[in-house]
From Swiss-Prot:
[4Fe-4S] cluster 1 binds at C24, C27, C30, C65. InterPro entries: 4Fe4S_Fe-S-bd (IPR017896), 4Fe4S_Fe_S_CS (IPR017900), Aldolase_TIM (IPR013785), GltB (IPR024188), GltB_archl_type (IPR043578), Glu_synthdom (IPR002932). It is an enzyme of class 1 (oxidoreductase). One of its GO terms (biological process) is glutamate biosynthetic process. It comes from Archaeoglobus fulgidus (strain ATCC 49558 / DSM 4304 / JCM 9628 / NBRC 100126 / VC-16). The gene is gltB. Pfam families: Fer4_7, Glu_synthase. Residues 15-44, 46-75 form the 4Fe-4S ferredoxin-type domain. This is Archaeal glutamate synthase [NADPH]. Disulfide bonds: none annotated.
Length: 511
């Protein structure tokens, strides 16, 4: 049980605030900008003061200070050094002793697991094959997501001038870049942030994922760029919701919290969110850990084809899972069950809220999962029957290029999009207080995010990454993204063990 009444915490502050009094003009901007009530004005002393115990390090006050009077940095106070009992472990124990609760956190896994992208390098053309200048020659990043035919058959006219495809084509979705916005639900993020993603995806010609919280009626005009989720809570799912979208995704798992469900507290379920999710206002939105109609591959197949039936077989159906130990076998079953797209969310996938112990200890890196899945599907001769979307830890365009060379068709990005909006990874998404207006339902905080401006920032990010991808493709002498897909000869490992190179399916540098 949580300690009540007056008691003195045993925890140390996480951050310290340095205030240049010679620069501070007592404008109280820092006080107004901080939703955690860190700053306050001392009338008697005519100076600003701060409660460092409340500071989460979001940097909003420092960024908005008109005189640059504030510096927020990690607190130097520490316990006696101990290799086994780090500061973080001690702080976590003390917090649980005071609250009696599960430790919650936001964002993705921040532990020092090996980041395989940083141990993989790309190839470049030298002498024997020419490189391509993307500024002067066309480069193709257009990607099609969905099941592909084994072969195409054509019917020719007698004079061979007219050609007709006789093969029945599966529904595919066209995107102009192999980058898609990850699932972030309305409720977990603000309406303004949600709308920004929709607007940016629509403008650039890619997709955004609604998450499991439904799609507001007024934003369904962006449906042709939406991946809508059918998750365990079935929030917001109705025929219109399914048919307005480009892709329907069955959410089985999430990289940040494999094997558990979700919980949106009632205080976040405002009237607009309750209408979108189709639940009473102010009630907790609980997503069960499993989908209670899926306990086998056969059950999954039934839901896949039920959704295909509901959408008149006009939408690709995706199935999203967390990257776990037997991910390759699971993915094979998903494809055979009828999934047109398989989405794999890795160990570093972000979240609005997750138990810290699960986020930091459950699942495997997406690099290894992707390589294993792509190889398994190729070995079984079914790779063309589904596209592979991967998520969880993509930080830059080079990560995207390496993922495609490992076998991905496209990647989800979540945290980079949030950072483009203003996020500083303070990891307090679960509190409902976000000084940048992203992960909050507080109208005062949410209005800080202007969808028109934020959408432009997101479009700029997509444009910059896409141009960098073209530069890297050109350097390899490749002019179309599809020629890179699964082309592991363009990759080499640096500083990796033999077993890691084997799983990744790449050679060591110099080979």
């Amino acid at each position: 049980m949580m300690l009540e009444g007056e008691f003195h915490t045993h925890m140390l502050p996480e951050f310290m605030i340095e205030r240049r009094q010679d620069r501070c003009i007592r404008c109280r901007v820092c006080e107004r900008q901080c939703g955690f009530n860190v700053h306050w004005y001392d009338e008697e002393m005519d100076m600003m003061r701060e409660d460092e115990m409340k500071c989460v390090g979001c940097q909003r006050c420092a960024v908005m200070c008109p005189t640059n009077a504030l510096v927020v940095k990690p607190h130097p106070g520490n316990y006696k050094p101990n290799a086994n009992w780090t500061r973080e472990r001690l702080q976590d124990l003390k917090k649980q002793a005071e609250t009696g609760g599960v430790l919650l956190t936001g964002s993705g896994n921040d532990k020092p697991y090996r980041i395989y992208w940083d141990h993989i390098v790309l190839n470049a053309s030298q002498v024997t094959n020419p490189s391509i200048d993307p500024l002067r020659e066309p480069m193709e990043l257009r990607t099609f997501l969905g099941r592909k035919q084994d072969r195409l058959e054509f019917k020719y006219s007698e004079d061979f001038e007219d050609i007709e495809i006789t093969t029945e084509l599966y529904p595919n979705v066209q995107i102009e870049t192999p980058i898609v916005f990850s699932a972030m639900s309305y409720g977990a993020i603000s309406y303004q942030a949600f709308k920004s993603l929709a607007m940016a995806a629509s403008e650039f010609g890619t997709l955004f994922n609604t998450g499991e919280g439904g799609l507001p009626k007024e934003l369904r005009k962006y449906g042709k760029n939406a991946i809508v989720q059918c998750a365990s809570g079935r929030f917001g799912v109705d025929p219109e919701y399914l048919n307005v979208a480009a892709v329907v995704e069955i959410k089985i798992g999430q990289g940040a919290k494999p094997g558990i469900g979700g919980h949106l507290p009632g205080e976040k379920v405002t009237l607009p969110i309750s209408v979108t999710r189709m639940i009473p206002e102010g009630t907790d939105a609980l997503s069960p850990a499993p989908q209670h109609d899926i306990y086998s591959i056969e059950d999954l197949s039934m839901l896949i084809y039920a959704l295909k039936e509901a959408t008149n077989y006009e939408k690709p159906v995706s199935v999203k899972i967390a990257a776990v130990h037997n991910v390759a076998a699971i993915a094979s079953g998903m494809v055979r069950a009828g999934a047109d797209i398989i989405a794999i969310d890795g160990l570093r996938g972000g979240t609005g809220a997750a138990p810290k112990m699960i986020r930091d200890n459950v699942g495997i890196p997406v690099e290894l999962a992707l390589a294993a899945v792509d190889q398994r599907l190729r070995d079984e001769g079914i790779r063309n029957k589904a596209s592979i979307l991967v998520a969880g830890g993509f930080r830059c365009s080079a990560d995207v290029v390496k993922a495609i060379a490992l076998g991905a068709d496209a990647v989800y990005i979540g945290t980079p999009a949030l950072v483009a909006m203003g996020c500083t990874l303070c990891q307090k998404c679960h509190t409902g207080i976000c000084n940048w207006g992203i992960c909050t339902q507080d109208p005062y905080l949410a209005k800080r995010l202007n969808p028109e401006i934020t959408a432009k920032r997101l479009v700029n990010l997509l444009r910059a990454w896409s141009h960098e991808i073209k530069e890297m493709l050109g350097g390899m002498g490749i002019n179309a993204i599809e020629s890179l897909r699964g082309n592991r000869e363009q990759l080499r490992g640096v500083g990796l063990e033999d077993w890691e190179l084997e799983v990744l399916g790449i050679k060591g540098a110099g080979e």
